[in-house]
Curated annotation (Swiss-Prot):
It holds the Pfam family KA1. Residues 398-440 form the UBA domain. ATP binds at I134, G135, K136, G137, N138, F139, A140, K141, V142, K157. Keywords: ATP-binding, Cytoplasm, Developmental protein, Kinase, Magnesium, Metal-binding, Nucleotide-binding, Serine/threonine-protein kinase, Transferase. This is Serine/threonine-protein kinase par-1. It is found in: Cytoplasm, Cell cortex. The lineage of its organism: Eukaryota, Metazoa, Ecdysozoa, Nematoda, Chromadorea. Residues 715-729, 882-891 have a biased composition (Basic and acidic residues). Required for cytoplasmic partitioning and asymmetric cell division in early embryogenesis. Phosphorylates and restricts the asymmetry effector mex-5 (and possibly also mex-6) to the anterior cytoplasm of the zygote. Regulates mes-1 expression during early embryogenesis. Critical role in postembryonic vulval morphogenesis. The gene is par-1.
Length: 1088
């Protein structure tokens, strides 16, 4: 699930800019392992199980064709031949006679470069011309391609099957099998499947509008009219899935894509499964903020009801721009979800509120079905003549004769009408069927396939002159031209290859190898500014090696990054630009690129050097920090834990709009997915699934991070260890392409030290180890700044990171209080990779190992590096997928004690834990009413934590089960003493509000005097209250057994424009009239 980690990095996506110098003219060997360069073994491909088979290599002469006469890997219309140069590289060549890239010594360098550029652009797979690479990962890469017959753009995912174990292959083919059954206008389409012994090609629908998540980040919450239009499409698509006995199980804003017309496309069916009445499922998968209560409770479920709950969370997110349930760790989120309490924004209509109450029902038996939801009043406002009804799929035997006639003309030399009709009627998902499907799609703008749009794909931040040239080049592009998307791995939450463009993202939602998922990621805001290269730009040669897919996965995707950027095996990407180019930008120099639509951060052949690129990128990113794109930081109130109680302050330095989560220490080469026996059904007997055997030993994705533990916390651990012993296995740290050997050794040493430190309090005071945040793996967190954390926090000073430090109060998202202790501190380095990351899809992005410890152990993480689970501006796309039963422990030897993010701590429940108030509100843009000291701070971009992957699902579920045992009693939130919130009296100040027209009660008294007066009046009126922060009180009045119960909060705020202080009233629950009555009475009685 989303907040529990980035463990599952099966296809950790890589921004194409990482291979900046890996073009055809580069002198660096692109492949050092010659055995990966496989020669073609056949001239003709065959058809396997209704799947077109593409050859894995080129031929020595002629054009390789499939059974349907389709060239599969041709360049320039000729044959694709691979000759080895002296540097050990393979070069595709064209022409009738020459098989060498360097034809003669007398040939000019200019003509050679032109030929190389022509070859790069003319690579074909089947009937698709590959335009550019838009995503790379450990096991797959994604190419933006153009169907040569219809001219439509598609996204081709190229998957290395040899890197997958049989279980992962089963999950992959189950996903493909499900996608083949789907035909809905709001679900991503699968057009074609091509397969060789080593490679699987999936041709998927391309969507250029990006993700709904990024739309919300760019524009803030939707008006209800706009949200209704989108939500009707979502409900229609999910109801269609349920009608076919399919559940999605990972519905969230990140998996909702937009096409060029801003229509919804549901993506990512990696966790989908079929269901049947009577056969309950028990796999806990999805994203925690979107997960239904029964998943947290460990109960089995039928299926559709978990999707219905997720739809309720999505509706709330669309209308409010925030999540209804939030928390700083899994335990806190679980409590809030199980209570089912959420805030209703004042601007939400009554009809929308009533509809939410049908979705967000704790008892799954009482949750409405989607058939009833479709009849709801809010769903049909403005659609009285078009009431939402279940989608009726067109009959399979309904054939479009016009398209058939076109197919006959197209394939007249190879197939007769009977063969064409058979392919279409039987839905073979091969060339003929794919062409038939694409002929039915709306034709795209041909201008987007121009040479300028095909070549201007560099992701670098270019100079002003280059930007001017790019601006001229983009005049020839359509404003609706799509931008590149990126592929992301289920097993990677941090390395999302973000490719940018105003058009949005590529819809790579279709498939994932069990945990290897190439979902479309939103394109990067920063890369969107870099966008176009001058017309002379030459794309990287990695687009020419389609016939040698295996080397592309492990060589090109990591070799250059490990050379140029030791910190990132998967190059950091940046956030996308708005689909329609409406994002406010501070730099006038980049305004001309707001319509850069065809630009894609794909290849980086024209970049002088990676160092120059990074410097230019940093310079532009500093200019592009936009307040409307930032989410607020939080400063949790200090914990009153006795003499050793430490305070927590989050730094608030201005953060560049880029991803810093390139530190991936666990890049597995063999994804492992465990699932329920009752869920891995007949697919295991599917004859179409090749069981790959003989796969060499692979490194384990499990990485045991080190611990940062203070002396007082270690004493608690020692006491708790007698009750719940833990296992620590330093050997579970494994080398990966993204962690250089020197960093790996540092991680190993720190882990050993932390392991021994768990038994000796003195060991926790060892000197901090040098750990550069950009180079350290996120799952191998060292105590690089533990001493600095303890020193600064014990003195009560806010932690510094970057240029400034501020404190910000964040109100809890529900009336429940957290019961965890947390200590945060910035990295020792001055990198702009800040530790406190606000997440949307899981605002507490926590790695699963953080929840694999016994819940009686309190772990306080100090001094996180940017490898913490809150990577700034990084999409933590994690999907939790595993058993929910306590006794189903993992067999992969993962640690019980995992890495604990900077601001996340799993503490002992009950009185033994320090109650710490505050929660992370993943505010999207334009939601600034909770900003603290807005005049003196900038806010971080809300990053996303996605869904939790498969390999650690069982351990996380076991941790949840342990939490359930401890929380077996009624969920009564512990009320922290007022003294606890007062530890930093001298440092905490009231929030400053810029807009004061809604402030009815003002005073010139000191804030503390106002708080005393408020408490006195509340006592006089018989109101129950809880002081959540120093200047905020949560109030309750009325009888909980009747409808008269009202909850609201009162906060003392500064009004700088009036030079006064004010009291802010905010209704949380209860009727409006009831709130107005009690609020007016209290306001009148306040003697301020």
């Amino acid at each position: 699930m989303s907040t529990v980690s980035s463990y599952f990095m099966g296809i950790s996506s890589k921004k194409n800019g990482s291979s900046a110098t890996a073009n055809k003219q580069s002198t660096r060997p692109q492949e050092s392992h010659h055995h990966r360069r496989q020669q073609p073994t056949s001239q003709q491909s065959t058809e396997m199980n209704g799947t077109t088979t593409a050859p894995s290599g080129g031929t020595s002469s002629g054009t390789t064709t499939t059974s349907s006469g389709v060239p599969t890997a041709s360049t320039g219309g000729g044959s694709a031949r691979y000759s080895s140069s002296s540097s050990g590289r393979s070069h595709p060549t064209t022409g009738g006679g020459s098989s060498s890239h360097a034809r003669s010594s007398g040939q000019s360098g200019m003509s050679s470069r032109s030929a190389a550029r022509r070859n790069d652009q003319d690579v074909h797979v089947g009937k698709y011309k590959l335009l550019k690479t838009i995503g790379k990962g450990n096991f797959a890469k994604v190419k933006l391609a153009k169907h040569v017959i219809t001219g439509h753009e598609v996204a081709i995912k190229i998957i290395d099957k040899t890197a997958l174990n049989p279980s992962s292959l089963q999950k992959l083919f189950r996903e493909v099998k499900i996608m083949k059954q789907l035909d809905h206008p709001n679900i991503v389409k699968l057009y074609q499947v091509m397969e060789t012994e080593q490679t699987l090609y999936l041709v998927l629908e391309y969507a250029s509008g990006g993700e709904v998540f990024d739309y919300l980040v760019a524009h803030g919450r939707m008006k209800e009219k706009e949200a209704r239009a989108k939500f009707r499409q979502i409900v229609s698509a999910v109801q269609y899935l349920h009608s076919k006995n399919i559940i999605h199980r990972d519905l969230k804003a990140e998996n909702l894509l937009l096409d060029q017309d801003m229509n919804i496309k549901i993506a990512d069916f990696g966790f989908s499964n079929t269901f049947s009445l009577g056969n309950k499922l028990d796999t806990f998968c999805g994203s925690p903020p979107y997960a239904a209560p029964e998943l947290f409770s460990g109960k089995k479920y039928d299926g559709p009801e978990v999707d219905v709950w997720s739809l309720g969370v999505i509706l709330y997110t669309l209308v409010s721009g925030s999540l209804p349930f939030d928390g700083q760790n899994l335990k806190e989120l679980r409590e809030r979800v199980l209570r089912g309490k959420y805030r209703i924004p004042f601007y939400m209509s009554t009809d929308c509120e009533n509809l939410l109450k049908k979705f967000l029902v704790i008892n799954p038996q009482r949750r409405s079905s989607l058939d009833n939801i479709m009849k709801d009043r809010w769903m049909n406002v403005g659609y009285e003549d078009d009431e939402l009804k279940p989608f009726i799929e067109p009959p399979k035997d309904q054939i479009d004769e016009q398209r058939i006639e076109k197919l006959i003309q197209i394939f007249q030399l190879g197939f007769n009408k009977a063969t064409i009709l058979e392919s279409v009627e039987k839905e073979k998902f091969e060339d003929i069927h794919a062409t038939y499907l694409l002929l039915g799609e709306r034709k795209s703008d041909p201008s987007r396939y121009s040479r300028s749009s095909a070549t201007a794909t560099g992701p670098s931040i270019t100079s002003g002159a280059a930007l001017a040239s790019a601006a001229n080049a983009q005049k020839h592009q359509s404003s609706a031209a799509p931008a590149s998307g990126s592929s992301s791995s289920r097993r990677s939450s941090q390395n999302d290859a973000a490719a940018s463009g105003a058009g949005g993202t590529v819809v790579m939602s279709g498939t994932r190898h069990g945990g290897v998922q190439m979902r479309a990621q939103p394109t990067s805001r920063q890369a969107a500014i870099s966008l176009l290269q001058p017309p002379s730009y030459k794309p990287s040669s990695n687009t020419t090696q389609i016939a040698q897919i295996p080397p592309l996965f492990n060589r090109n995707s990591t070799a250059t990054s490990s050379t140029n950027q030791p910190s990132s095996g998967i190059t950091a990407g940046t956030r996308k630009i708005d689909p329609k180019g409406r994002i406010p930008l501070n730099s006038a120099a980049v305004q001309s690129h707001r319509t850069a639509t065809g630009a894609v951060a794909a290849n980086t052949g024209g970049i002088p050097s990676q160092r120059d690129h990074s410097q230019q990128q940093q310079q532009y990113m500093n200019q592009l920090t936009s307040s409307s794109m930032m989410s607020k930081l939080i400063n949790k109130t200090p914990a009153a834990g006795g003499a050793n109680a430490t305070t927590s302050a989050t730094s608030a330095a201005a953060a560049p709009l880029q991803k810093s989560g390139s530190q991936i220490s666990h890049a597995p080469t063999e994804p492992v997915i465990r699932e329920d026996d009752d869920e891995s059904n007949s697919e295991h007997q599917n004859g179409n699934v090749p069981l790959i055997g003989g796969v060499g030993p692979q490194t384990s994705p499990v990485v045991a991070p080190s611990e940062d533990v203070t002396s007082s916390e270690q004493q608690k651990q020692e006491k708790a260890s007698s009750e719940a012993p833990k296992e620590t296995k330093p050997s579970m740290i494994h080398q990966s392409p993204s962690m250089p050997p020197s960093q790996m050794m540092t991680a190993m040493e720190s882990l050993k030290l932390s392991e021994s430190g768990g038994k000796s309090p003195s060991n926790s005071q060892q000197p901090p180890q040098r750990a550069t945040s950009q180079q350290m793996s996120r799952s191998a967190t060292t105590n690089s700044a533990a001493n600095m954390a303890s020193n600064q926090q014990s003195s009560g000073a806010p932690q510094q990171s970057g240029a400034s430090s501020q404190q910000c109060h964040t109100k809890p998202s529900s009336t429940s209080s957290s019961s965890s202790s947390s200590t945060t501190a910035p990295t020792s380095s001055g990198q702009p990779h800040h530790q406190h990351q606000l997440t949307h899809n899981a605002s507490f992005s926590v790695t699963p190992s953080a929840y694999q410890m016994p819940t009686t152990t309190t772990i306080t993480s100090g001094a996180p590096t940017s490898s913490s689970a809150f990577p700034r501006n990084t999409r933590n796309r994690q999907t939790f997928h595993g058993k929910t039963e306590k006794d189903k422990g993992g067999d992969d030897g993962s640690d019980e004690i995992g890495d604990t993010p900077a601001n996340v701590s799993i503490g002992a429940t009950g009185a033994s834990a320090n109650n710490t108030e505050g929660t992370i509100w993943s505010k999207l843009s334009k939601l600034t009413r909770r900003d603290h000291n807005r005049e003196s701070m900038t806010q971080p971009v809300s990053s996303r934590a996605g869904t939790i992957g498969a390999a650690q699902g069982q351990q996380t579920a076991a941790a949840l089960a342990a939490i359930r045992e401890q929380s077996s009693g009624p969920l009564t939130p512990g009320t922290p003493p007022v003294a606890q919130a007062m530890t930093q009296e001298g440092d905490v100040k009231p929030r400053s509000l810029r807009f004061t027209w809604s402030m009815k009660t003002t005073s010139s008294l000191a804030p503390d005097d106002m708080m005393r007066e408020i408490r006195k009046v509340l006592d006089a009126n018989g109101c129950d209250y809880e002081q959540r922060e120093r200047y905020m009180i949560l109030c309750v009045h009325g009888d909980p057994n009747t409808d008269s119960l009202v909850q609201w909060e009162m906060e003392v705020c500064k009004l700088p424009r009036l030079s006064l202080n004010g009291v802010r009233f905010k209704r949380i629950s209860g009727t409006s009239i009831g709130f107005k009555n009690i609020a007016s009475k209290i306001a009148q009685e306040l003697n301020l």
